[in-house]
Amino acid sequence: MEYISTRGHVKDAGSASRFTDILLAGLMPDGGLAMPMDYPRLAASDLAAMRRMNYRELALSLLSLFADDIPLADLKATIDRTYTADIYGNARADEDPQDITPLRTLEPGLHLLALSNGPTLAFKDIAMQLLGNLFEYVLTRNGQSLNILGATSGDTGSSAEYAMRGKRGIRVFMLSPLGKMSAFQTAQMFSLQDPNIHNLAVRGVFDDCQDIVKAVSNDHAFKAKYRIGTVNSINWARVSAQIVYYFKAYFAATRHDGEAVSFSVPSGNFGNICAGHIARMMGLPIRRLILATNENDVLDEFFRTGVYRPRATAETRQTSSPSMDISKASNFERFVFDLVGRDASKVRELWTSVDRGGAFDLSGTPWFAGIADHGFVSGRSTHADRLATIRRVFERHELMIDTHTADGIKVGLEHREAGVPLICLETALPAKFAETIGEALGRAPLRPPGFENIEDLPQRSVAIEPDVQAVKDFIARHVAA
């Protein structure tokens, strides 16, 4: 499998980018995102064979299509080490951790995909644990080291840090918006004392953090000198790892290949639902991809109107689903690349405007008309909606859900179709957002063992201005130390 950039960069003939090249690189040299030259297409016989596979077997079958420069035995060993019941052991009492991503039926035709049973209780563990093991495998094989620079609005940071702590040859520099995460999320990250983990609390919002990561990644001299890599959802390996659970959920929710299902996905940075889009392009029978936003509704606005208008820092709202408090979706470029027929020059034109603080408008174009062909619909959820949905699910199904999952269920139900199974993606366990759960239900969610008093642990972080040079200086000092 060869990889190209959404903005047109292709390596010289005879040295095309492969999976292990882009694994460590983050952004492509032209500032675009890595994409497969072509999506593998699966035949009916492939789906029939996959239906009988467990999670590890399914992951190997799918990821070997994208990572074919890793020997199959090595890839299998990495996958087998990643997807175990021990690592994903925070399942509810009636879920089997051997399933890795258990599917729960709430009522006939309505399902919840449990993605948050990993070490940090968030869906991002599914891909991040694999990413940590892949990084260590490639770095050890090549005798290299890597300095990971990431940005988080809540869950990516802790997921990345737990996946990378203690890994040979890896340091993590994680940017988060100061005071914008839940107390639980903050404690998960800042309580880590590992010497290879550095938490930088940026005086700004998540988009400031993300912009700094992109700016550093686009400084090719600095990136090369300090071996900068990324774990954010711009990393193709994360997206490809997330494709697996769409297939697993499909097989669990259907009896026969060819049946169509719809997925509802809480969306901030577009990485999770981007994996669903790619699964659909590969031939998985997905009827609708239902994108749910919170009050930061940049993506909902695009899918309704064709206008993509990232908000300024001052316009980004702080909400009770903080991991979606994002106004510039970094993975969205991948979908637009497909939407415009993989015309890299058009993507460059559109993102030149975005990168300068502007917007673009595809309304009235054949591209916008083609969104329906990709199965996308969208909707928006507010704090009041979240509270009502949390209450509804608890009263009807005796199940506590977190705030982001509530956004997904609320919008998913608005687009539910008779006769089409609806699978809502659970993105975190409610223990991470006890304040809002208490507001909705008048009681606190139970915490898995080991998380009972996490907020009381000593915390370590460094407050920093939203300044690219300040972050570069911090990295340089600690890499040289």
Segments the model singles out, each with a brief description of its role:
Residues 1-481:
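PLP-dependent amino-acid enzyme catalytic core
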